[in-house]
């Protein structure tokens, strides 16, 4: 896996600043180009929406775009990193559409976004934008919540991030295979420890539970070949209970720096590997979540 270009949408909030700092760290590590995108949704501004003439609307439009560009320049200056190649992009339109369009145009390998991390997924930093981007993006989407530990990923003084412990959640489906490969690649890149987690959410009868756990454990042990990944530090974990609760609990216990999950990317996000679990983990988890499309 190669990360040559990272796209980071910016709305100038503390949440997008957090995601941008994380993106800077990754760009520095992978020697990747970082594209900072700000989307101007002019239709949200009453002064432009109620313009009485086309000329007046164009004046408002130009002013909003110019102001967005100036704000983006100032934002990037506050998070300077001379070693990283950056590009600033200001687009007019609907946030999710422009993010996806920019990702396609620039052939982004990763999209990094921030969220409030509050209860209710509709309270994401970009509203339903993160939802739409996760479902439609062809590249992985890194979601950095306000609950994420600032020291989660610490490689440089300017961008204190490092990846020492990665947690991969799997249900053994084909959809989670790409997430596994991605997690392994990142773990090898950072010489990180990787923990493979499976949650037995619908536990069978007590008499059958032991054999079910043993069968799942056997599948976990086969996911990564120690012979093919000799330098990789591999752990496995089996849990019984509500998936999101067990994932969040283990991530905190293990002090995971990154949680990797697979998503279908089609239809409602309820079709994600863990259904609504992905949402809940993003709300409650203390580390960034990397959603990898199947």
Go through each PLM region and give its residues:
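Well-ordered alpha-helical segments embedded in enzymatic catalytic cores
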Residues: 19, 71, 98, 179-182, ...
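Conserved beta-strand segments of alpha/beta enzyme cores
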Residues: 85-87, 140, 193, 233-235, ...
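Gly/Ser-rich helix-loop-strand patches that form or flank binding pockets
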Residues: 2-4, 25, 29, 100-152, ...
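Small/aliphatic-rich secondary-structure junction motif
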Residues: 1-54, 159-210, 224, 233, ...
């Amino acid at each position: 896996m190669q990360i040559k270009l990272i796209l980071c949408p910016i709305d100038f909030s503390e949440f997008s600043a957090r995601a941008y700092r994380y993106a800077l760290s990754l760009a520095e590590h992978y020697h990747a180009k970082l594209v900072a995108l700000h989307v101007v949704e002019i239709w949200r501004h009453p002064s432009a929406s109620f313009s009485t003439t086309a000329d007046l609307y164009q004046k408002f439009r130009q002013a909003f775009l110019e102001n967005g560009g100036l704000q983006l320049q100032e934002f990037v200056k506050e998070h300077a990193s001379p070693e990283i190649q950056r590009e600033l992009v200001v687009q007019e339109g609907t946030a999710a559409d422009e993010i996806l369009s920019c990702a396609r145009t620039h052939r982004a390998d990763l999209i990094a976004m921030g969220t409030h991390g509050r209860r209710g997924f509709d309270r994401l930093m970009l509203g339903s934008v993160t939802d739409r981007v996760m479902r439609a993006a062809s590249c992985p989407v890194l979601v950095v919540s306000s609950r994420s530990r600032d020291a989660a990923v610490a490689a440089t003084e300017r961008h204190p991030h490092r990846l020492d412990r990665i947690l991969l959640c799997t249900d053994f489906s084909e959809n989670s295979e790409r997430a596994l490969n991605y997690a392994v690649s990142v773990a090898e890149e950072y010489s990180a420890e990787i923990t493979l987690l499976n949650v037995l959410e619908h536990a069978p009868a007590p008499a059958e539970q032991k054999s079910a756990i043993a069968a799942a454990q056997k599948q976990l042990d086969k996911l990564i070949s120690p012979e093919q990944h000799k330098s990789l530090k591999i752990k496995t974990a089996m849990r019984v209970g509500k998936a999101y609760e067990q994932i969040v609990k283990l991530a905190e216990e293990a002090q995971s720096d990154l949680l990797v999950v697979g998503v279908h990317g089609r239809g409602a996000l309820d079709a994600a590997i863990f259904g609504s679990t992905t949402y809940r983990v993003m709300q409650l988890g203390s580390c960034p979540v990397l959603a990898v499309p199947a």
